[in-house]
Amino acid sequence: MAGLHPLPTSNDPVLLRAGRRGCLLVHGFTGCPWEMRYLGERLHEADITANVVRLAGHGTSEADMEGVAWEDWYGSALAGLDALEEHTDEIVVVGQSMGALLALKLAAENPERVRGLVLLAPALVTATSWLPLAAPLIPFVLTAFGDRYRFVRKEGGSDIADEAARTAIPSYAATPLRSVVQLVRLQAHARRLLPQVRQPTLVIHSSQDHTCPIDNVGILQRELPGPVRTLVLRDSFHVVSVDKDRDLVAAEVAGFVSSGGVAAG
């Protein structure tokens, strides 16, 4: 069911100050702050301070993203955590898709600072199962063919069932191949960190996700040592924060944060 609130009009990062419980919201690969603002606004209404960040190389141009490493994306997320701490007493990190990988790294490396995790459509593995095998070849392709294969255009837009949201989302129209290499490296790095993540975790994923298969849920249930609660959506695709179930997602996240990150039940 579509949300009762209008979709965001701004693509800027924003700190929405409210109560002393806080949420850091981290968007996905080739995404932008817009995809997390709707959730941030709903959390703010629930008296939760929300910091919607923009990752390095995102929300500007594909060329900007091309020169950025995954460590730079993590640096953006870490800076967002630092900023949010100035206004809150406890923090839950909410990451979508690739942002979920960064959230896992934040939790593993900052256990005293991150109270809990919400992973929206996490991208530990993607529907393009051969990508990890192909990624090491990408630098050779770029050297051999130059600009011809520098960017890969997205076909059909973002993986969103809601037509209005799919039309409105201002994500990149093409993906830099160099950035794909960085994504694969981040996936491997995040997978190695899973045994270190002991915070309560809420995983929200759609059974209709065409980008990151529902298999991601099973991986997290098996490999995270801390408590994990899952919610499987039926009407949304990949970008669940703005898709047909966006109000349900917002309510579940707000409840999780307000409970202090309790995942059991």
Give the predicted meaning of each segment.
Residues 43-62:
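Conserved alpha/beta-hydrolase
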Residues 95-99, 103:
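Gly/Ala-rich beta-loop-alpha elbow adjacent to hydrolase catalytic centers
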Residues 118-127:
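Active-site nucleophile loop of the alpha/beta-hydrolase fold
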Residues 176-193:
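Active-site nucleophile elbow and catalytic-triad environment of alpha/beta-hydrolase enzymes
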Residues 197, 203-205, 209:
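Short beta-strand/loop motif that positions the catalytic acidic residue
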Residues 210-216:
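Conserved alpha/beta-hydrolase "acid-adjacent" motif
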Residues 218, 222-239:
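Catalytic histidine neighborhood in serine/cysteine hydrolases
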Residues 234-265:
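Catalytic active-site module of serine/aspartate enzymes centered on a nucleophile-bearing elbow/loop
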